[in-house]
């Protein structure tokens, strides 16, 4: 009985990707950028706690509903064949129940925020639910993922400043483009499998132009973040962080130049450092 309970618990951990925090970190860094920018420094501590915990919960919820949506495909993809659903370790109804629990806890936290933030949270839930199914219908599902991974930015401004200034939407746009860039690197890992299954991705859509388009998206991200710095009157630490991020983008281009699966995955993982460096630049600016 203990062994069965342990295996079930491990399956839930895998469903929620608690053992793979990269997605949580990629969602967390821009959320923290937005909180600090909206507050002109250290944000309200309760708001900070709600968003950090909320990021963890909603990223996990997104992974859970993604596995439910892909339950008939994951067993045919090398990278995902060992997930709990295709392995038969959990039932589809259990996956939906776990998603509901995670989403409800997240919503309970949001209810402690102001009405504007609560209203925006419904769009966040809709995006989280819709994204996994977009791989069947639109040629660039990463656009929806980018919106989902960026929606915490206007929510952060709403919670901290009770307003949605233009700069909030610039940060949103920068993060949207960055997300498409790094998730295209991720999609390059699965491109051959996705083609066989008839699934869609930006890596398939961009084809042989993938590296150039990723580079263009990365450049646009940096240019928009430069504008954010000007509008927010940020100091030199922020611009040094953007320069460091640019160097990492160049490094990622070197990694993906041969389109090898492992190298593309390493380029994707490297984006964690991009987000962390920009956050460090923002925080140091306000010290």
UniProtKB/Swiss-Prot annotation:
HAMAP family linked to this entry: UbiA
GO cellular component: plasma membrane
Name of this chain's protein: 4-hydroxybenzoate octaprenyltransferase
Cofactor: Mg(2+)
Function: Catalyzes the prenylation of para-hydroxybenzoate (PHB) with an all-trans polyprenyl group. Mediates the second step in the final reaction sequence of ubiquinone-8 (UQ-8) biosynthesis, which is the condensation of the polyisoprenoid side chain with PHB, generating the first membrane-bound Q intermediate 3-octaprenyl-4-hydroxybenzoate.
Gene Ontology molecular function terms on file: 4-hydroxybenzoate polyprenyltransferase activity
Reaction it catalyzes: all-trans-octaprenyl diphosphate + 4-hydroxybenzoate = 4-hydroxy-3-(all-trans-octaprenyl)benzoate + diphosphate
């Amino acid at each position: 009985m203990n062994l069965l309970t342990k295996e079930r618990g491990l399956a839930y951990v895998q469903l929620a990707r608690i053992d793979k925090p990269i997605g949580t970190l990629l969602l967390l860094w821009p959320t923290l950028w937005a909180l600090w920018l909206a507050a002109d420094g250290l944000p309200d501590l309760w708001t900070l706690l709600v968003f950090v915990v909320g990021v963890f919960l909603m990223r996990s919820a997104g992974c859970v509903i993604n596995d439910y949506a892909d339950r008939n495909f994951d067993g045919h993809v090398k990278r995902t064949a060992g997930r709990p659903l295709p392995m038969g370790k959990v039932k589809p109804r259990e996956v939906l129940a776990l998603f509901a629990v995670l989403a409800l806890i997240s919503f309970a936290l949001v209810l402690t925020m102001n009405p504007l933030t609560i209203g925006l949270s419904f769009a966040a839930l809709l995006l989280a639910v819709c994204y996994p199914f977009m791989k069947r219908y639109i040629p660039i599902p990463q656009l929806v993922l980018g919106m989902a991974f960026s929606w915490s930015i206007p929510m952060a401004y709403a919670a901290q400043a009770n307003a949605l200034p233009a700069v909030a939407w610039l940060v949103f746009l920068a993060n949207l483009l960055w997300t498409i860039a790094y998730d295209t690197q991720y999609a390059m890992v699965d491109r051959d499998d996705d083609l066989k299954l008839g699934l869609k991705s930006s890596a398939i859509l961009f084809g042989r132009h993938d590296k150039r388009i990723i580079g263009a998206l990365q450049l646009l991200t940096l240019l928009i973040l430069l504008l954010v710095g000007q509008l927010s009157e940020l100091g030199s630490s922020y611009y040094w962080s953007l320069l460091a991020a640019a160097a990492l983008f160049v490094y990622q281009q070197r990694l993906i130049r041969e389109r090898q699966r492992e190298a593309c995955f390493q380029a994707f993982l490297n984006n964690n450092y991009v987000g962390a460096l920009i956050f460090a630049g923002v925080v140091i600016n306000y010290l």
